[in-house]
C-alpha cells in the first residue's frame, strides 16, 4: 500500500487542537497552590511561619530539576544511538514530553490534587507529571523509529491516562509503596510499549535493518544520555519521598545499586564476547538497571549491602537480556523492541517489584523501630491492624496490576495506532530522519593515510587530495592547503559499519 508521510495538514492541526484544549482545561481547573499564590504571606502569618525557606519549593525544586533533566536530556539522548534517527530521537522525545507533562498535570491533578473544584498546582505536581511522562519515554523506546509523531502524540495521550489510573489504584486503593516507580513507571511503561510494538509488528522491517545500527559518534551521543540518567537517578528515586530519613535513604540505596550494576555489566559484557571486548549497547543501558531495580524498595530499610546486591543482579540480567533475550523476542514472539526496553526497564522493573514485596514482608520493628515502621508503611489509623505480610501482598498485587494494565492498555492503543491515516513510514523507510525532518546535506570528510591510499586502486582513492561530494551537493568544501594525508569525501551511507 502507499504510505503518505506528509504531515503538513495533520500534524499542525493536531498540535494546535491539543494545545488549545490544554489552555481551556487549565483555565477551568488549574489554580496555584497556596504556597505558590500571592496570598502565601497570609498563610505564613496564620501558621506563624517566619521564613520563606519553609515554602515547599525550596525542598522539592532541586529534585525536580534533576528529574526534569532526565526526562528531556537523559531519555532523549539515550535514544540517539541510531545512525540516521538522532533528530527524531531527541525531537520527538521533546514533543511527547512537552505535551505529556501538560496532560499529566491535569490527569494527576484530578486524581491527587483536586480540592473544591480546582487542581492546586505546586512543584510537587511537576515532579509527579515528570514521573508520568518518564513512563511514556520508556514506551517510546520500544517503537523508536517505527511510528510517526502523530502516533506518538496519540500514544502519549492514552498512556498518561492509563498510567494515572494504574498509579491511583496501586498507591491509594491497594496501598502499595513504589517510591522510585519500579512498578508504576518502569514495569508499566516497558510492557505497555512492548505490547504496542507487538501489535504494530512490521514483517518487512528487515528492509530498514541497515539503519537500525549505530556509528561511532551516535554511540557517543547516546552515552551522554546514559551519564545524565546515571548521575541523576538518586534524585529520581527519592524525589517524591517524605523529607528526612526516608528521602535520604532512597538516594543512598539508589546510588549504591547503580554503582554495582556498572561493574557487573562490564564483567558480563566482556565475558560473553569471544575476544573479551565490551559492547557499547550494554554499557549505555544495562549500567542503569540498578536504578530501576532498586526503585520500589529505595526508601525501605534495604540496607547498603542489599542495595549493592540488587544492582549486582540487575546488571547481569540486563546485559544477558540484550545479548540473548532480545533476539529471541524478535525472532520467536515478533516483538521488535528497538531500544531493548525489556532488558533495561521490564526485567529490572519486575525485580524491583519483587524486592519491594520481600523487603516489606520481612520488615520488623527491630529494624525500623515501632514509630519508624508506622511512618514508613503508613501503619496506624484505619491501617492499625495492617501487618507486614499484608503489605508484602499489596506489593505483589501492585506489580500484577501494573502488568495487567500495561498488556490490556497496550493492545487497545496498539490497534488504534495501527490505523493507516497516522502518517507512519513504510517498512523500508523506518529509522530515517529525512521522512519527517528537513535534514541538511551531508558531506563527510575522511582522511586516508598516504601509505594506505597507495594500496588502493587509483580509481577509488587517488594519490592527490580529491573531494567527492554527494550528487545533490551544490557546494564542495575547499581542500585544506597542505593536508597531512590524502583527502576524500564520501557520502554518509558509505561510513556505516
From Swiss-Prot:
Subunit and interaction comment: Homotrimer.
Keywords: Ammonia transport, Cell membrane, Glycoprotein, Membrane, Transmembrane, Transmembrane helix, Transport
Tissues of expression: Expressed by connecting tubule cells and intercalated cells of the collecting duct in kidney (at protein level).
Membrane topology: Multi-pass membrane protein
Positions on the Extracellular side per record topology: 31-61, 115-125, 175-179, 241-251, 304, 362-395
GO CC, any one term: apical plasma membrane
Protein localization: Cell membrane; Apical cell membrane
GO molecular function list: ammonium channel activity; ankyrin binding; carbon dioxide transmembrane transporter activity; identical protein binding
PTM statement from Swiss-Prot or TrEMBL: N-glycosylated.
Coiled coil: none
Protein's UniProt name: Ammonium transporter Rh type C
All ranges on the Cytoplasmic side of the membrane: 1-9, 83-93, 146-151, 201-219, 273-282, 326-340, 417-497
GO terms classed as biological process: ammonium homeostasis; ammonium transmembrane transport; intracellular monoatomic ion homeostasis; regulation of pH; transepithelial ammonium transport
Catalytic activity: NH4(+)(in) = NH4(+)(out); methylamine(out) = methylamine(in); CO2(out) = CO2(in)
Residue stretches spanning the membrane: 10-30, 62-82, 94-114, 126-145, 152-174, 180-200, 220-240, 252-272, 283-303, 305-325, 341-361, 396-416
Function according to Swiss-Prot or TrEMBL: Ammonium transporter involved in the maintenance of acid-base homeostasis. Transports ammonium and its related derivative methylammonium across the plasma membrane of epithelial cells likely contributing to renal transepithelial ammonia transport and ammonia metabolism. Postulated to primarily mediate an electroneutral bidirectional transport of NH3 ammonia species according to a mechanism that implies interaction of an NH4(+) ion with acidic residues of the pore entry followed by dissociation of NH4(+) into NH3 and H(+).
Organism field: Rattus norvegicus (Rat)
Top-rank taxon: Eukaryota
Residue positions the entry lists as glycosylated: 48
Family: Belongs to the ammonium transporter (TC 2.A.49) family. Rh subfamily.
Short name of any one Pfam family annotated for the protein: Ammonium_transp
Amino acid at each position: 500500500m502507499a504510505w503518505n508521510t506528509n504531515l503538513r495538514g495533520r500534524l499542525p492541526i493536531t498540535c494546535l487542537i491539543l494545545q488549545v484544549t490544554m489552555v481551556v482545561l487549565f483555565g477551568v481547573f488549574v489554580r496555584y497552590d497556596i504556597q505558590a499564590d500571592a496570598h502565601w504571606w497570609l498563610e505564613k502569618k496564620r501558621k506563624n511561619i517566619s521564613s520563606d525557606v519553609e515554602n515547599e519549593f525550596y525542598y522539592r525544586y532541586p529534585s525536580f530539576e534533576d528529574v526534569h533533566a532526565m526526562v528531556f536530556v537523559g531519555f532523549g539522548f539515550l535514544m540517539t544511538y541510531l545512525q540516521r534517527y538522532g533528530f527524531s530521537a531527541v525531537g520527538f522525545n521533546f514533543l511527547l514530553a512537552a505535551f505529556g507533562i501538560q496532560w499529566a498535570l491535569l490527569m494527576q491533578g484530578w486524581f491527587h490534587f483536586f480540592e473544591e473544584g480546582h487542581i492546586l498546582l505546586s512543584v510537587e505536581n511537576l515532579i509527579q507529571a515528570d514521573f508520568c511522562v518518564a513512563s511514556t519515554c520508556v514506551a517510546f523506546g520500544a517503537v523508536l523509529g517505527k511510528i510517526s509523531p502523530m502516533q506518538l502524540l496519540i500514544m502519549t495521550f492514552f498512556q498518561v491516562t492509563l498510567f494515572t489510573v494504574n498509579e491511583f489504584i496501586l498507591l491509594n486503593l491497594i496501598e502499595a509503596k513504589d517510591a522510585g516507580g519500579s512498578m508504576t513507571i518502569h514495569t508499566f511503561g516497558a510492557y505497555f510499549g512492548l505490547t504496542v510494538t507487538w501489535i504494530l509488528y512490521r514483517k518487512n522491517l528487515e528492509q530498514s535493518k541497515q539503519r537500525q545500527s549505530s556509528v561511532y559518534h551516535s554511540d557517543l551521543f547516546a552515552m551522554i544520555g546514559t551519564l545524565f540518567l546515571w548521575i541523576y537517578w538518586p534524585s529520581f528515586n527519592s524525589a517524591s519521598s517524605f523529607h528526612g530519613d526516608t528521602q535520604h535513604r532512597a538516594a543512598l540505596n539508589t546510588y549504591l545499586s547503580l554503582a554495582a550494576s556498572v561493574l557487573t555489566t562490564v564483567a558480563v559484557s566482556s565475558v560473553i564476547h569471544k575476544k573479551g571486548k565490551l559492547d557499547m549497547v550494554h554499557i549505555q543501558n544495562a549500567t542503569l538497571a540498578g536504578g530501576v531495580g532498586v526503585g520500589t524498595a529505595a526508601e525501605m530499610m534495604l540496607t547498603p549491602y542489599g542495595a549493592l546486591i540488587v544492582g549486582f543482579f540487575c546488571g547481569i540480567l540486563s546485559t544477558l537480556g540484550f545479548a540473548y533475550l532480545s533476539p529471541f523476542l524478535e525472532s520467536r514472539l515478533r516483538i521488535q523492541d528497538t531500544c531493548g526496553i525489556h532488558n533495561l526497564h521490564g526485567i529490572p522493573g519486575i525485580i524491583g517489584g519483587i524486592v519491594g514485596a520481600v523487603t516489606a514482608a520481612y520488615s520488623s520493628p527491630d529494624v525500623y523501630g515501632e514509630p519508624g515502621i508506622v511512618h514508613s508503611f503508613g501503619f496506624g489509623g484505619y491501617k492499625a491492624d495492617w501487618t507486614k505480610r499484608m503489605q508484602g501482598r499489596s506489593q505483589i498485587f501492585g506489580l500484577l496490576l501494573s502488568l495487567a494494565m500495561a498488556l490490556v492498555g497496550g493492545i487497545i492503543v496498539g490497534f488504534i495506532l495501527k490505523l493507516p491515516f497516522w502518517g507512519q513510514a513504510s517498512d523500508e523507510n523506518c529509522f530515517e530522519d529525512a521522512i519527517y525532518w528537513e535534514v541538511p546535506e551531508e558531506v563527510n570528510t575522511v582522511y586516508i593515510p598516504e601509505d594506505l591510499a597507495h594500496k588502493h586502486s587509483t580509481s577509488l582513492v587517488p594519490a592527490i587530495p580529491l573531494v567527492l561530494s554527494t550528487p545533490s551537493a551544490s557546494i564542495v568544501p575547499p581542500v585544506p592547503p597542505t593536508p597531512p594525508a590524502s583527502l576524500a569525501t564520501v557520502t554518509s551511507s558509505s561510513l556505516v559499519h
